[in-house]
From Swiss-Prot:
Its main location: cytoplasm. The keyword Plastid does not apply. Coiled coil: none annotated. It is found in: Cytoplasm. It comes from Mycolicibacterium paratuberculosis (strain ATCC BAA-968 / K-10) (Mycobacterium paratuberculosis). This is Thymidylate synthase.
Length: 266
Protein backbone atom coordinates (compact mmCIF):
# COMPACT_ATOMS: atom_id res chain seq x y z
CA UNK A 1 0.00 0.00 0.00
CA UNK A 2 1.49 3.40 -0.95
CA UNK A 3 2.61 5.68 1.86
CA UNK A 4 0.39 8.78 1.96
CA UNK A 5 2.41 11.95 1.37
CA UNK A 6 0.01 14.92 1.64
CA UNK A 7 2.67 17.17 3.18
CA UNK A 8 5.26 16.45 0.51
CA UNK A 9 2.59 16.87 -2.17
CA UNK A 10 1.84 20.35 -0.82
CA UNK A 11 5.54 21.25 -0.90
CA UNK A 12 5.63 20.31 -4.60
CA UNK A 13 2.46 22.26 -5.32
CA UNK A 14 3.80 25.44 -3.71
CA UNK A 15 7.15 25.10 -5.49
CA UNK A 16 5.41 24.64 -8.83
CA UNK A 17 2.51 27.07 -8.54
CA UNK A 18 3.25 29.39 -5.64
CA UNK A 19 3.04 33.15 -6.09
CA UNK A 20 6.11 35.22 -5.22
CA UNK A 21 5.24 37.40 -2.23
CA UNK A 22 6.99 39.70 0.19
CA UNK A 23 6.59 39.06 3.90
CA UNK A 24 7.04 40.58 7.35
CA UNK A 25 10.56 39.14 7.76
CA UNK A 26 11.85 40.57 4.46
CA UNK A 27 12.92 37.11 3.29
CA UNK A 28 10.44 36.56 0.45
CA UNK A 29 8.25 33.51 -0.15
CA UNK A 30 6.43 31.35 -2.66
CA UNK A 31 2.86 31.13 -1.42
CA UNK A 32 -0.54 29.52 -2.01
CA UNK A 33 -3.72 30.26 -0.07
CA UNK A 34 -6.19 27.81 1.45
CA UNK A 35 -4.71 24.30 1.38
CA UNK A 36 -5.62 21.18 3.36
CA UNK A 37 -3.90 17.99 4.54
CA UNK A 38 -5.59 14.93 6.09
CA UNK A 39 -4.06 12.18 8.22
CA UNK A 40 -5.77 9.02 9.50
CA UNK A 41 -4.30 8.82 13.01
CA UNK A 42 -5.33 5.19 13.36
CA UNK A 43 -2.97 4.32 10.49
CA UNK A 44 0.18 5.77 12.07
CA UNK A 45 1.57 8.82 13.80
CA UNK A 46 2.18 11.58 11.19
CA UNK A 47 5.79 12.38 12.00
CA UNK A 48 7.35 13.38 8.67
CA UNK A 49 9.97 10.87 7.47
CA UNK A 50 11.54 12.74 4.53
CA UNK A 51 13.56 14.63 7.13
CA UNK A 52 14.03 14.06 10.84
CA UNK A 53 11.65 16.06 13.04
CA UNK A 54 12.92 16.90 16.53
CA UNK A 55 10.31 15.01 18.55
CA UNK A 56 11.67 16.14 21.91
CA UNK A 57 10.88 19.76 21.06
CA UNK A 58 7.40 18.82 19.79
CA UNK A 59 6.50 17.03 23.01
CA UNK A 60 7.94 19.55 25.43
CA UNK A 61 6.36 22.48 23.60
CA UNK A 62 2.92 20.84 23.77
CA UNK A 63 3.35 20.07 27.47
CA UNK A 64 4.40 23.70 27.96
CA UNK A 65 1.25 24.92 26.21
CA UNK A 66 -0.87 22.61 28.37
CA UNK A 67 0.77 24.09 31.47
CA UNK A 68 -0.54 27.50 30.42
CA UNK A 69 3.02 28.79 30.43
CA UNK A 70 4.46 31.63 28.36
CA UNK A 71 8.02 31.92 29.64
CA UNK A 72 10.84 29.95 28.04
CA UNK A 73 12.43 29.11 31.41
CA UNK A 74 10.57 25.78 31.68
CA UNK A 75 11.54 24.88 28.11
CA UNK A 76 15.18 25.72 28.85
CA UNK A 77 15.15 23.41 31.87
CA UNK A 78 14.31 20.62 29.44
CA UNK A 79 16.84 21.63 26.79
CA UNK A 80 14.38 23.17 24.32
CA UNK A 81 15.23 26.51 22.70
CA UNK A 82 12.74 26.80 19.82
CA UNK A 83 11.08 29.95 21.21
CA UNK A 84 14.24 31.85 22.09
CA UNK A 85 14.22 34.12 19.02
CA UNK A 86 11.00 35.79 20.16
CA UNK A 87 11.47 35.86 23.95
CA UNK A 88 12.25 38.98 25.98
CA UNK A 89 15.39 39.31 28.10
CA UNK A 90 13.46 37.72 30.98
CA UNK A 91 12.21 34.87 28.77
CA UNK A 92 8.65 36.16 28.54
CA UNK A 93 6.55 35.83 25.38
CA UNK A 94 3.36 37.53 26.48
CA UNK A 95 -0.09 35.89 26.47
CA UNK A 96 0.60 33.37 23.68
CA UNK A 97 -0.84 29.90 23.05
CA UNK A 98 -0.69 28.32 26.50
CA UNK A 99 -2.12 31.37 28.23
CA UNK A 100 -5.06 31.53 25.81
CA UNK A 101 -5.67 27.77 25.94
CA UNK A 102 -5.76 27.62 29.73
CA UNK A 103 -6.59 31.13 30.91
CA UNK A 104 -8.54 33.16 28.34
CA UNK A 105 -9.53 36.40 30.09
CA UNK A 106 -13.18 37.46 30.18
CA UNK A 107 -14.57 41.02 30.49
CA UNK A 108 -15.68 40.22 34.06
CA UNK A 109 -12.10 39.48 35.12
CA UNK A 110 -12.51 35.70 35.18
CA UNK A 111 -10.54 33.23 33.05
CA UNK A 112 -11.65 30.32 30.86
CA UNK A 113 -9.71 27.07 30.69
CA UNK A 114 -10.52 26.15 27.09
CA UNK A 115 -8.79 22.75 27.22
CA UNK A 116 -10.81 21.65 30.25
CA UNK A 117 -13.98 23.02 28.68
CA UNK A 118 -13.33 21.11 25.45
CA UNK A 119 -12.71 17.89 27.37
CA UNK A 120 -15.91 18.37 29.34
CA UNK A 121 -17.89 18.70 26.11
CA UNK A 122 -16.21 15.63 24.60
CA UNK A 123 -17.34 13.62 27.62
CA UNK A 124 -20.84 15.05 28.05
CA UNK A 125 -21.91 16.29 24.60
CA UNK A 126 -19.65 14.73 21.95
CA UNK A 127 -21.98 15.76 19.11
CA UNK A 128 -21.54 19.43 19.99
CA UNK A 129 -20.35 21.65 17.17
CA UNK A 130 -18.79 24.04 19.68
CA UNK A 131 -15.80 21.99 20.84
CA UNK A 132 -13.33 24.68 19.88
CA UNK A 133 -10.11 26.12 21.29
CA UNK A 134 -8.82 29.47 20.04
CA UNK A 135 -5.49 31.17 20.58
CA UNK A 136 -6.49 34.19 18.45
CA UNK A 137 -7.43 36.70 21.14
CA UNK A 138 -7.62 39.94 19.18
CA UNK A 139 -7.52 42.13 22.27
CA UNK A 140 -4.25 40.59 23.47
CA UNK A 141 -2.35 40.22 20.19
CA UNK A 142 -0.39 43.47 20.72
CA UNK A 143 1.06 41.96 23.91
CA UNK A 144 2.12 38.70 22.24
CA UNK A 145 5.72 38.23 21.10
CA UNK A 146 4.31 36.52 17.99
CA UNK A 147 0.63 36.38 17.01
CA UNK A 148 -0.62 32.78 16.84
CA UNK A 149 0.19 31.03 13.57
CA UNK A 150 -1.82 27.91 14.45
CA UNK A 151 -4.76 29.90 15.68
CA UNK A 152 -7.89 27.81 16.11
CA UNK A 153 -8.84 24.13 16.35
CA UNK A 154 -12.04 22.12 16.58
CA UNK A 155 -12.78 18.59 17.75
CA UNK A 156 -15.34 16.29 16.12
CA UNK A 157 -16.61 12.89 17.28
CA UNK A 158 -18.13 10.25 14.99
CA UNK A 159 -18.52 6.52 15.70
CA UNK A 160 -16.43 6.82 18.85
CA UNK A 161 -13.49 8.37 16.99
CA UNK A 162 -12.07 11.80 17.76
CA UNK A 163 -10.90 14.02 14.92
CA UNK A 164 -9.29 17.43 15.10
CA UNK A 165 -9.11 20.20 12.52
CA UNK A 166 -6.56 22.99 12.90
CA UNK A 167 -6.64 26.33 11.11
CA UNK A 168 -3.14 27.74 10.64
CA UNK A 169 -3.24 31.31 9.32
CA UNK A 170 0.48 31.39 8.46
CA UNK A 171 2.26 28.18 7.52
CA UNK A 172 6.05 27.97 7.18
CA UNK A 173 5.89 24.74 5.23
CA UNK A 174 9.49 23.63 5.57
CA UNK A 175 10.29 24.38 9.21
CA UNK A 176 7.00 24.87 11.00
CA UNK A 177 4.32 22.65 9.52
CA UNK A 178 5.92 19.20 10.16
CA UNK A 179 6.23 20.29 13.79
CA UNK A 180 2.62 21.50 13.93
CA UNK A 181 1.24 18.32 12.37
CA UNK A 182 3.00 16.17 14.97
CA UNK A 183 2.00 18.45 17.85
CA UNK A 184 -1.71 18.49 17.09
CA UNK A 185 -1.75 14.79 16.25
CA UNK A 186 -0.28 14.17 19.71
CA UNK A 187 -2.82 16.50 21.32
CA UNK A 188 -5.63 14.61 19.55
CA UNK A 189 -4.32 11.32 20.95
CA UNK A 190 -4.20 12.85 24.45
CA UNK A 191 -7.71 14.29 24.23
CA UNK A 192 -9.09 11.02 22.85
CA UNK A 193 -7.50 9.05 25.68
CA UNK A 194 -8.94 11.40 28.29
CA UNK A 195 -12.42 11.25 26.73
CA UNK A 196 -12.45 7.47 26.27
CA UNK A 197 -12.42 7.69 22.48
CA UNK A 198 -10.37 6.22 19.64
CA UNK A 199 -8.47 8.52 17.30
CA UNK A 200 -9.89 9.56 13.95
CA UNK A 201 -8.38 12.11 11.56
CA UNK A 202 -6.14 15.10 11.98
CA UNK A 203 -7.10 17.71 9.39
CA UNK A 204 -4.67 20.57 8.81
CA UNK A 205 -6.02 23.65 7.05
CA UNK A 206 -3.55 26.35 6.05
CA UNK A 207 -4.17 29.98 5.12
CA UNK A 208 -0.99 31.52 3.70
CA UNK A 209 1.00 28.36 2.90
CA UNK A 210 4.52 29.41 2.03
CA UNK A 211 8.06 28.30 1.37
CA UNK A 212 10.66 30.92 2.21
CA UNK A 213 13.03 31.76 -0.64
CA UNK A 214 16.00 30.69 1.49
CA UNK A 215 14.41 27.26 2.07
CA UNK A 216 13.90 26.30 -1.58
CA UNK A 217 17.05 24.22 -1.94
CA UNK A 218 16.32 22.41 1.31
CA UNK A 219 12.81 21.62 0.10
CA UNK A 220 14.16 20.24 -3.18
CA UNK A 221 16.52 17.99 -1.22
CA UNK A 222 13.66 16.79 0.97
CA UNK A 223 11.47 16.02 -2.05
CA UNK A 224 14.26 13.94 -3.60
CA UNK A 225 13.94 11.45 -0.75
CA UNK A 226 11.72 8.38 -0.63
CA UNK A 227 9.04 8.57 2.09
CA UNK A 228 9.12 5.85 4.74
CA UNK A 229 6.28 4.35 6.81
CA UNK A 230 4.94 6.48 9.64
CA UNK A 231 5.84 5.41 13.18
CA UNK A 232 3.50 4.26 15.96
CA UNK A 233 2.63 6.38 18.99
CA UNK A 234 2.32 4.74 22.40
CA UNK A 235 0.81 7.05 25.02
CA UNK A 236 0.89 6.10 28.69
CA UNK A 237 -2.27 6.32 30.79
CA UNK A 238 -2.73 9.44 32.89
CA UNK A 239 -5.74 10.47 34.96
CA UNK A 240 -5.61 14.05 33.64
CA UNK A 241 -4.44 15.60 30.39
CA UNK A 242 -2.38 17.96 32.52
CA UNK A 243 -0.46 15.08 34.12
CA UNK A 244 1.37 13.87 31.00
CA UNK A 245 5.16 13.94 31.05
CA UNK A 246 7.75 13.59 28.31
CA UNK A 247 8.35 9.94 29.24
CA UNK A 248 4.66 9.15 28.70
CA UNK A 249 5.07 9.74 24.95
CA UNK A 250 6.85 6.93 23.09
CA UNK A 251 7.21 6.75 19.31
CA UNK A 252 8.14 3.34 17.90
CA UNK A 253 9.78 2.64 14.53
CA UNK A 254 10.55 6.22 13.53
CA UNK A 255 13.09 5.82 10.73
CA UNK A 256 13.45 9.23 9.05
CA UNK A 257 15.96 10.56 6.59
CA UNK A 258 18.53 12.92 8.17
CA UNK A 259 17.53 16.36 9.41
CA UNK A 260 17.92 19.32 7.04
CA UNK A 261 18.98 22.63 8.54
CA UNK A 262 17.52 25.94 7.43
CA UNK A 263 17.43 29.49 8.85
CA UNK A 264 14.39 30.63 10.83
CA UNK A 265 12.69 33.77 9.53
CA UNK A 266 12.10 35.96 12.59
Amino acid sequence: MPIPTPYEDLLRLVLDRGTAKSDRTGTGTRSLFGQQLRYDLSAGFPLITTKKVHLKSVVYELLWFLRGDSNVDWLHRHGVTIWDEWASDTGDLGPIYGVQWRSWPTPSGEHIDQISAALDLLRTDPDSRRIIVSAWNVGEIPRMALPPCHAFFQFYVADGRLSCQLYQRSADLFLGVPFNIASYALLTHMMAAQAGLSVGEFVWTGGDCHIYDNHVEQVRLQLSREPRPYPELILAHRDSIFDYTYDDVVVHNYDPHPAIKAPVAV
